[in-house]
């Protein structure tokens, strides 16, 4: 896992601290929501790592293809599809890293304020709902990338 030194969001100290603070203040449902969001971000990071590996394999296979007209057409189509997918993966990776940073900074802010002002400050945990909306948007972006890739694969299969 190459994203941010491979540390999962669920293992971040500030996230653990926030979860503990929420549980101590009988806010188990909010703690579960925060943990669910963090787990989802961790899962997205793993999927992006898998995409990276698949794209690398795809690129290596394209390089190994033989030289003839039909294969060259398929090779060109595959290369274009691979480039589009790689661009999409980079965009998604960037979005996930932004969300991860947002989760960490929101958690730190809520924890710091919770320590200073007590339980009422912990209700700011509702800010995580905005992050959840962003994650749902990223999920739609991933689904779009999958559909585009499936179409590219189908087109390439027709060439072969």
Predicted features and spans:
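Extended, low-complexity amphipathic alpha-helical repeat segments
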Residues: 99-160
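Amphipathic alpha-helical coiled-coil segments
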Residues: 88-102
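Leu/Val/Ala/Ile-rich N-terminal alpha-helices, chiefly Sec-type signal peptides and the beginnings
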Residues: 1-90
């Amino acid at each position: 896992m190459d994203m941010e030194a491979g540390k999962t969001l669920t293992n971040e100290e500030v996230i653990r601290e926030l979860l503990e603070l929420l549980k101590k203040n009988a806010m188990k449902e909010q703690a579960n929501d925060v943990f669910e969001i963090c787990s989802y971000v961790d899962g997205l990071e793993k999927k992006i790592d898998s995409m990276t590996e698949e794209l690398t394999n795809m690129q290596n296979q394209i390089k190994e293809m033989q030289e003839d007209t039909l294969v060259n057409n398929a090779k060109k189509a595959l290369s274009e599809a691979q480039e589009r997918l790689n661009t999409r993966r980079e965009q998604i990776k960037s979005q996930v890293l932004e969300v991860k940073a947002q989760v960490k900074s929101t958690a730190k802010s809520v924890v710091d304020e919770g320590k200073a002002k007590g339980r009422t400050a912990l209700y700011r945990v509702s800010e995580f709902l905005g992050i959840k909306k962003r994650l749902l948007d990223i999920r739609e972006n991933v689904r779009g990338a999958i559909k585009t890739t499936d179409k590219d694969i189908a087109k390439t299969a027709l060439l072969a």
